[in-house]
Amino acid sequence: MAGAPAPPPPPPPPALGGSAPKPAKSVMQGRDALLGDIRKGMKLKKAETNDRSAPIVGGGVVSSASGSSGTVSSKGPSMSAPPIPGMGAPQLGDILAGGIPKLKHINNNASTKPSPSASAPPIPGAVPSVAAPPIPNAPLSPAPAVPSIPSSSAPPIPDIPSSAAPPIPIVPSSPAPPLPLSGASAPKVPQNRPHMPSVRPAHRSHQRKSSNISLPSVSAPPLPSASLPTHVSNPPQAPPPPPTPTIGLDSKNIKPTDNAVSPPSSEVPAGGLPFLAEINARRSERGAVEGVSSTKIQTENHKSPSQPPLPSSAPPIPTSHAPPLPPTAPPPPSLPNVTSAPKKATSAPAPPPPPLPAAMSSASTNSVKATPVPPTLAPPLPNTTSVPPNKASSMPAPPPPPPPPPGAFSTSSALSASSIPLAPLPPPPPPSVATSVPSAPPPPPTLTTNKPSASSKQSKISSSSSSSAVTPGGPLPFLAEIQKKRDDRFVVGGDTGYTTQDKQEDVIGSSKDDNVRPSPISPSINPPKQSSQNGMSFLDEIESKLHKQTSSNAFNAPPPHTDAMAPPLPPSAPPPPITSLPTPTASGDDHTNDKSETVLGMKKAKAPALPGHVPPPPVPPVLSDDSKNNVPAASLLHDVLPSSNLEKPPSPPVAAAPPLPTFSAPSLPQQSVSTSIPSPPPVAPTLSVRTETESISKNPTKSPPPPPSPSTMDTGTSNSPSKNLKQRLFSTGGSTLQHKHNTHTNQPDVDVGRYTIGGSNSIVGAKSGNERIVIDDSRFKWTNVSQMPKPRPFQNKTKLYPSGKGSSVPLDLTLFT
């Protein structure tokens, strides 16, 4: 529209008018400009929206990406393309406004290649930093595809380490030669890098390593510039190799670089592109291959020792392999550094890579990046120490370590040990990047820290566990053990203070039911075991009239106390739990895992001492109560069980001296400690005694029911315990079948006792059937009560839908006749 009006303006003015046409031209031109700007603005807005996401995340890295695209386009596409990025990239990158649409135009001119670079970069995330090194590769080989492919290839590269080691080294080889080749042109490389960081991160580094990328991008130009004069042709490669061998390998690596530098440089562009294509094709394998990366990395490592000679023989291929190995190996060098074995640097690095499969994958993904990173960070780090180079090499690892930390640790425990020293050192150079290698250890430490906290709760292992847990290759087994221990702890509730006896017993009982370990602690707390061993008897006691039968089933030692102590036990029983509570807390803090009976015995001894102090006052009343109720209980106890051990407990109450019962209490727990098997029975009765005694103490009226229970016990003893359960729960056992066949329903008669709850004073809601149930229907007056007919009996017919088999409420129909 704008072009057309320019020629026609002269003719239209006469029609419009003499004066009007000129303003119309200016107006039209202005309108056209406005329209064009608006239309462009629409496109620009779209472009901005798409590109803003990346630059906002990437900052300085964005400039590097833009530079890379610009440089690539300059060499690969016509020179016309580079000026556009060159002019637009820095300005627009700085502005982050108008330049972004221009970048899109560049991508359109560059055809699909820049677009893949844009699309690929989001996947690599960390690749942007890698992309910066590929830029030197791009100058070496004029091909726009190279930068775009490395960005895309960066993700596949990790796949390749797992899938095939050679391609990875080859990919780094391309970066390696460019670095030496760029040695002479080193200043140019840094120049390209600043531009590259401006653009590429925008597309590639979204969120993973924006800070990391920015750091390498910023540091890369100065470091290579400074280091390049020092090392001249080989400086960039020299720094990366030093990390792998620490010191001894520096000369070795430099030599292969010398041999490799000239030939591979020529081959790199051609060789690098096919490898990139292969890597792109292999991207799909990434997910499946990563799991096996450790084994394949080992194969690469095995190949690595042979590779150094190869560079001398075949500079292009060995160089490709050799450089990648140092960049990939640099993470392992941490091991050689720790192990102080330069000879093993080639082979030793091999084992470390498995722990850093993610690191390897990241390095491979950023294989180009790996080489640039060492030049950027490696030169300063070697100046500082040999270990920092390892950090530099590990720098590519940072993104992967967080996901692989478990795998990394499992793969090599030694690396974790080495990584521990690395952890403190790397953090200083780059905050996020430094954490990369240490990050792998730190995440486990975080896990371990959380776990040590659990372990500290469990035992004194916390201090040692923080270091040892981090280093071992298998933190997972420790986690499982810790979790198991945690369960025991939480069940025991060592951290929490016990407020009431009932709750304590419940918590302890649950813990014992769940885990065996608490049992040693529980001996100190005698009551808890009853729930586990005699949980059914305990329920039966609550629901039935036979409190003493359960005591006899549990063991007789406490039963005398139960009979004697029915009123007093609540006071006496509580003290043991109180004493036991401090012991469990101490035990939980000191040693929850220790099953030694001696410690428990000591704790028990302590516990009895406290009960000893408390019980003496209650003991005399207990003896007085015992005089009343001892006879039936004793008879039952002696009849039911051999009272070799039981006789001893009764003897202390006979002594009647308060101190004696106090001593007898400790003696009983000690015996239970000495004999783990017999100990539970006494403990269980103590619980039953406590519960019964507490209920009795709360309701003195309920104390009489236990004595009648023996008679019921005698009647019930004839039946098997299972039958007793049913009868105690649902009936008194007196119900019998009067008719085998019901004449009314023509069906076999049913024992109502199986479906009716037997009433007792101890059961709420169901009372013993000695009273007639009266329904208060005073509000309802039936005038024809006398005239209401009785229902006729149902006879000589079969009920299709028979009604209930009985009543859930105990009914004694004799009371209503």
Swiss-Prot record:
The keyword Repeat appears for this protein: yes
Superkingdom to which the source organism belongs: Eukaryota
Domain WH2, chain residue ranges per copy: 30-47, 87-106
Entries under SMART domains matching the protein: WH2
InterPro entries referenced in this protein's UniProt entry, alphabetically: WH2_dom (IPR003124)
UniProt biased composition (Low complexity): 62-79, 336-348, 383-395, 408-422, 447-469, 518-534
Name recorded for this polypeptide: Verprolin
Organism (species): Saccharomyces cerevisiae (strain ATCC 204508 / S288c)
